[in-house]
Each structure stands twice: as C-alpha cells, then as structure tokens.
Swiss-Prot record:
Function (record text): N-acetyltaurine hydrolase that catalyzes the hydrolysis of N-acetyltaurine into taurine and acetate. PTER also acts on other N-acetyl amino acids (Met, Ile, Leu, Val) and N-propionyltaurine, but at lower rates.
Binding residue positions for a divalent metal cation 1: 26, 28, 169, 298
Main location: cytoplasm
Catalysed reactions, as listed in the record: N-acetyltaurine + H2O = taurine + acetate; N-propanoyltaurine + H2O = propanoate + taurine; N-acetyl-L-methionine + H2O = L-methionine + acetate; N-acetyl-L-isoleucine + H2O = L-isoleucine + acetate
One example of a Gene Ontology biological process annotation: taurine metabolic process
Molecular function terms, GO-annotated: N-acetyltaurine hydrolase activity; zinc ion binding
Classification of source organism: Eukaryota, Metazoa, Chordata, Craniata, Vertebrata
Top-level taxon in the UniProt lineage: Eukaryota
Protein family (similarity comment): Belongs to the metallo-dependent hydrolases superfamily. Phosphotriesterase family.
Gene3D superfamilies, per database record: Metal-dependent hydrolases (3.20.20.140)
Enzyme class: hydrolase
Organism of derivation: Tetraodon nigroviridis
Required cofactor(s): a divalent metal cation
Cofactor binding mode and count: Binds 2 divalent metal cations per subunit.
Protein name, as recorded: N-acetyltaurine hydrolase
Length: 349
C-alpha cells in the first residue's frame, strides 16, 4: 500500500479524514459532456441551438443532452465557485470530482476552486466510457493502463503535480466493451497497489453493476472500497437491488435534482423523482445497508446550476435531508450517509 495510508488525498494534498465533513461523492465542477450529445426531438432543432433563455429552461430540463452549450460545464467556473461557497455555507465540506481522462479534467482549476472556497476537492484518476478512449488508450495493455492510473494518484495527472485521490469515475457501457474491460482490470490492479477508493459508472442495464463487480474482483479489486454510481437509473426492482447490495460495494444514489420524463440514453428507464430516491434510501436503511449508502447530484450540465435556474450543489443539504428525516431516516443515519460513509470510502488503506 502507499504512504497515503489513513489519509484522504485532495487536490491541495493529503488531509485527515475527520476534516472532510459532509461530502458529495459524485459531482463535476468543470468538464465537457459533448461526447454524449443526443440529437433533439424532431422539430426542436431551433430551440436546441438558441442561446439560453428563461423560456427554454423547462425544455432543457427535459432534453439536457440535446443542446451543445448545455454540455460545456467547463465554461462556468465563476458560477461553480459561487455554488461551492453556497454549499460550504449550507454545511458542505467536501466534493468528489469525478471528471476523468476523456471529458476534459482540469486539475489546476479544481485546485484554485478549493483554495477559493475552502471546500475539499478530491479528483478522479482513470478513464471514462469507451467513446472517449483514444487510439493510444485502446492500444495500451492492462499493465500500462494501471501504471498510468497509479502515477496519477502518486505523482500527478495531466502534466501537473496535482494528485488524484480516487480512481474514477471509471466509465462502462452495456454491454461492456473490450477497452472498458481492460480499464476495469487496470483499475483493480492499481487499487490493489494503492489501497485507494474506486468509483464506477455502470452501463444502463440492471445486470451491469454486478458484472462490473465480477470483473473487478477477478482482477484483484477491493469491492468494499468501491462505489457503484447511478443506481437510481440502473436497478429499480427491490429484490435485484438487495441481491446487488450483498456484493459489498457502496450504493450511490447520485442524480438528486434530476427529474425528466424521457431518458435519451435508455428509453426503457423511467427516471425516478427525488421522492422516489429518498424512498429507495429508506428501503436500503431498513434492510441494514446504512453503512454503505452515499449520495450526490452528479451535476454535469449547465442547466442544473442555480445560475440557470437549477438546483445546484446545495440541493441535498437544503432540500433532500429534511425529506429523508420526514421519511423515517434518523439524523444519525443521515450523518452516516453524508459524513461517515464517504470518509471511510475515501480513506486510503
């Protein structure tokens, strides 16, 4: 294991885990999501290409991936800075920034945002989904990919001395591609060397999370130090959810604030409401998984920032926590979900 044992690695350096406080485990502060642009519905092309206007905000909430400008969160650093200050004022302490190679990770900006706001920011190492892999990435062996990931954690990424504190979000599709499978194996190898946290973006199929776990386990990964993201858009059946929970990963509900009628990446998915997400958390708590739940918003488009009428990074603290308490989740359990579980996950072995 690395000499980071017992520490959390932020963009400003290692810190004691007790310093983190309330932590959002899956956010983006600066990124491009143009890799996943989806054409607008027929007849809506003019709206999709027009400048942001208040009259179009509802359309953007329903079609966030069909407007090129909306996918460029990296253009809104000043707005994100103000959001982080508001998040800290609301009681937030840390954010895990999940932008990896392929979607324009910007470590110097993350470092500056942390300095400016006092929010601990943990950056992600590794690679996103297959469509963002370069030919060089595809040609790399598992060993070489692992070496790159380890270096991003121990020495710094993207030509900087800014070190990542988590591997991920590691992107996978459904079915998992050959290139993604190599990255998963490399992730497991790197994790076994470093004793570090890992976070996964699973494909949009109920079987995807368990298949990822199987690949990681067979390659030597530590599932107890791994977060499975996006469960709120992936596993809907309670029985299937409990079967997956038994595998031992952290269970992340990370699309709070995102409510849409039609999910373009999988038309079979009915995106849940925030009330349904809270209901799922209460179910998992009742079933004994309060020590394995983490939450976030996964903000990755402009329209979800408060600047553009969105919910922002403080939504969970201001709006979801009171709802959790009203739905039978105790304050102690809320504290586990927001403070203790992220702290345990992020601490290097």
């Amino acid at each position: 294991m690395s000499n980071l044992s017992g520490k959390v690695q932020t963009v400003l350096g290692p810190v004691d885990p007790e310093q983190l406080g309330k932590t959002l485990t899956h956010e983006h502060l600066t990124m491009s999501f143009e890799c996943c642009y989806h054409p607008p519905p027929a007849g809506d092309e003019a709206v999709a290409e027009s400048p942001f206007q208040m009259q179009h905000m509802y359309w953007l909430r329903q079609n966030p991936y069909s407007c090129h400008e909306n996918l460029l969160l990296l253009q809104e650093t000043l707005a994100v800075r103000e959001e982080l200050l508001a998040y800290r004022k609301a009681g937030g302490g840390a954010v895990v920034e999940n932008t990896t190679t392929g979607i324009q990770r910007d470590l110097p900006t993350l470092r500056q945002l942390s300095k400016d706001t006092g929010v601990h920011i943990i950056a992600g190492a590794g690679y996103y989904v297959d469509c963002t892999h370069t030919e060089d990435t595809r040609r790399m062996s598992v060993e070489k990919l692992s070496d790159v990931i380890v270096s991003e954690v121990l020495h710094g990424a993207d030509g900087t001395d800014i070190r990542c504190g988590v591997i991920g979000e590691i992107g996978t599709c459904w079915p998992i591609t050959d290139s993604e499978r190599k990255v998963l194996k490399a992730t497991a190898h790197a994790q076994s060397q470093l004793g570090c946290p890992v976070i996964i973006h699973p494909g949009r199929n109920p079987a995807a999370p368990a298949e990822v776990v199987r690949i990681l386990q067979e390659a030597g990964g530590d599932i107890s130090k791994t977060v499975m993201s996006h469960l709120d858009r992936t596993i809907f059946d309670e029985g299937e959810l409990l079967e997956f929970a038994k595998l031992g990963s952290y269970l992340e509900y990370d699309l709070f604030g995102m409510e849409m009628l039609n999910y373009p990446y999988n038309s079979e998915v009915d995106m849940p409401s925030d009330s349904q997400r809270v209901k799922a958390l209460a179910f998992l708590v009742k079933e004994g998984y309060e020590d394995k739940i983490v939450v976030a918003h996964d903000i990755h488009t402009k329209n979800r920032l408060t600047k553009f009428g969105g919910h922002g990074y403080s939504h969970i603290l201001k709006n979801i926590v009171p709802k959790m308490l009203r739905r039978g989740i105790s304050q102690r359990q809320v504290d586990k979900i927001l403070v203790d579980n992220p702290k345990e996950w992020l601490t290097f072995k």
